[in-house]
């Protein structure tokens, strides 16, 4: 049995009191739009939305759960088996995200994407929706990169993997949808577009991305000839075994978490009240994902075990070596 090193997460965990109802309503929404998630009973995407937006309105939290249903199902569609039309499919979906009407009826993926973003439009400001749509586009761009790597049986170098895997994991889209839509937080644009807030979002996104990689790497290894995740990338690039790659993955993840915690405190201390709420609520995306992963069996086919620790493996307040694209996160 492969043991994943313990996860360090000094962030609060909470869940919306209407989590069970949201799961039922999100599932009904998915069925209405023909969104089929094979393991919905185990995954419970609506409940995940309740972890991400524990203090949001019911409508906002439900909208996040509906997007989770659609996104999990769509991600599975892109992966198993690898379809050859990924660039076409992702382009049509993003077009549907950007166009609120007329209703799309000839493609269930596009129809579902349009419908859920129309839910966002009913709940949020145009600026909030734009941030979500722009980062949704980044996700689908990253999915095309991953698809090309799988088709060509290619493992990318670490310096390439770090920025592009964050897109492919939908990490920034997830964070923004969970916080802006689920909790109805509207940070002034001047603050939202600042380098410091961008760094806050990226460090949260990368922490969550590595958590996702660590939870799923064994399952993916059984399903693809060349599996692409942080563990396999480190093994390939550094010529190390799986145990050492896991240790290095967790150390890298904890360094991102350390930087996120510093930026979270700084934004809460020096920013607007909405930025303070944004920074605090981002923490629920990280902690909520971990608790949801423990609760569900999405990755139950693996033989990995998961535990938690109060001590980071690496809390060095400096950028990790060999990844130029993230050095700026430590210069602010």
UniProtKB/Swiss-Prot annotation:
List the keywords (alphabetical).
Lyase, Magnesium, Metal-binding
Q: Which residues bind substrate?
A: 165, 298-299
Binding residues for Mg(2+) 1: 75, 80
Q: Which cofactor does it need?
A: Mg(2+)
Q: How would you classify this enzyme at the top EC level?
A: lyase
* Metal-binding is among the record's keywords: yes
Q: What is this protein called?
A: Tsukubadiene synthase
* Organism of this sequence: Streptomyces tsukubensis (strain DSM 42081 / NBRC 108919 / NRRL 18488 / 9993)
